[in-house]
Amino acid sequence: MAFIRRTVQTNIFEEFYPTTLAFNAGKKNYFLGHSKDKSYMIYNMTDAGKIEPTVVVQKGKLKTYLQNIQAFYDTTQNKQYLYGYNLDEKVIDVYQIADNASIVLMYSEEFTVEDSIKSATFFIINGVLCFYTQSDKTKNWYIYNLINY
């Protein structure tokens, strides 16, 4: 398989977004840009993969600047979530993504770790939210269950 890179769109945002995510909600595509001042913007995306910079779905400030964000889906409850973490501040935030692409904070935790974490991801198995981490120093890894009670 061969790939050829071609430019399909170029534009300018008012902010620099060091953390970004493209995701799907309600059968539509969206782009989230998140800046170090904790602000974020969610933009509509076309079916051709182009960002519509004038169509802002939601904007605001997150609780924390998140260095990495990902989306994951709970098949048992048909809900989608966005999670992010800041390894410097040792913070994990989980947001629920609505069908209209708006996000609402569902869970936030300041965490302590057994080692120095440099890798992390969330996933859901049988309706249980799990968090994987790995230390770059010791190579030890851990899986935690985050149980709602």
Roles of regions detected by a PLM:
Residues 66-73, 80-90:
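Loop/turn-rich, solvent-exposed surfaces of beta-rich toroidal or solenoidal domains
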Residues 32-73:
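Eukaryotic tandem repeat interaction scaffolds
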Residues 3-12, 56-63, 109-113:
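Surface-exposed loop and turn segments in beta-propeller and other repeat-based domains
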Residues 12-26, 61-74, 113-125:
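Repeated scaffold domains used in trafficking and secretory/extracellular systems
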Residues 1-6, 48-55, 100-107, 149:
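Beta-strand initiation motifs
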Residues 119-149:
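Blade-level signature of beta-propeller repeat domains, shared across WD40, Kelch, NHL, RCC1
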Residues 27-31, 77-82, 127-131:
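Entry beta-strands of beta-propeller and related beta-repeat scaffolds
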Residues 37-44, 88-96, 137-146:
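Structural motif
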